[in-house]
Amino acid sequence: MPASPLVWINGLHMTEQRPIAVLGGGSFGTAVANLLAENGHQVRQWMRDPEQAEAIRVNRENPRYLKGIKILPGVTAVTDLQETLDACELCFVALPSSALRTVLAAHAERLSGKMLVSLTKGIEAQTFKLMSQILEEIAPQARIGVLSGPNLAREIAEHALTATVVASEDEELCKAVQAALHGRTFRVYASADRFGVELGGALKNVYAIIAGMAVALEMGENTKSMLITRALAEMTRFAVNQGANPMTFLGLAGVGDLIVTCSSPKSRNYQVGFALGQGLSLDEAVSRLGEVAEGVNTLKVLKAKAQEVGVYMPLVAGLHAILFEGRTLEQVIGLLMRAEPKTDVDFISTSGFN
């Protein structure tokens, strides 16, 4: 049975349901919109392209993303952002990191007091701000959260058993999201570490590119395991430097998201890496994908930030050297393997069993 269509807002279950907004017409936004509709909610999925919206209304399928997935009747594709924001209290923001600020800044006054939950796993290039931090800057009176985890959009849409994390210091927002999304195939856990959960989701995209390259080059299971494990160490080291809780990275939004993104051909960033491993240029790999691969943009800003704050991230530096500095894969592998080994796990005692 679908969940009750009651929404938990301001600490109370409301008897009159308001529609829920999903901002963005991509694959993940579409999957979340369908989840909400399956749970009995009326959903307004906003997108900029009128042709895309019309195709969804007529054919009940997103023509660009998630082909073959029928969009439920409870989802209405719309193009009027002002009207959508005025009608909805709970808004899931699934806009590309490069567009989020531009799209929402013009409607800042309408965001005050609303629950804004970012679904975007990216970092703004100019400021190194995460998406929830941009939302906070645009709408300081809004209630902010993030949703992140091992969540491949097509698998969610096909009802594979899936779990995710909603993170916010606002406990009532977490309850509202859990009430709206939790269903027979989708489980929602809560966390107060918004920064750690969101940073995990953004950073792992870089390592998915590396993992895709390794698979294309048939590097073997030992290599793939090493890459994923050392990626987790790098991510955690950087996140703790920035103020996150290292324990967050042992959960769904850390190691969980990293594993699925680095091991699944359905991952967009993995696909880019695989194409690179096959010999395509970066431009060719991104063009073949036809969708946004946040890891490419994240790599640039993460490399610069790691240097600025003095965090050791050899995998990030190595991938950056291949994609943007003209180094060959063989050169980078040689440098990585000759580097002095550090301790295996940070944040635990290195002095024996004390």
UniProtKB/Swiss-Prot annotation:
Q: Which reaction does it catalyse?
A: sn-glycerol 3-phosphate + NAD(+) = dihydroxyacetone phosphate + NADH + H(+); sn-glycerol 3-phosphate + NADP(+) = dihydroxyacetone phosphate + NADPH + H(+)
Q: Which Pfam families match?
A: NAD_Gly3P_dh_C, NAD_Gly3P_dh_N
Please state the pathway this protein functions in, per its UniProt record: Membrane lipid metabolism; glycerophospholipid metabolism
- What is its EC class? oxidoreductase
Cellular localisation: Cytoplasm
Q: Which residues form a coiled coil?
A: none
- Enzyme Commission designation: 1.1.1.94
Q: Which family is this sequence assigned to?
A: Belongs to the NAD-dependent glycerol-3-phosphate dehydrogenase family.
> Matching HAMAP family, A to Z?
NAD_Glyc3P_dehydrog
Q: What does this protein do?
A: Catalyzes the reduction of the glycolytic intermediate dihydroxyacetone phosphate (DHAP) to sn-glycerol 3-phosphate (G3P), the key precursor for phospholipid synthesis.
Protein name from the UniProt record = Glycerol-3-phosphate dehydrogenase [NAD(P)+]
Identify the species of origin. Pseudomonas fluorescens (strain Pf0-1)
Native organism taxonomy = Bacteria, Pseudomonadati, Pseudomonadota, Gammaproteobacteria, Pseudomonadales
Name the gene that codes for it: gpsA
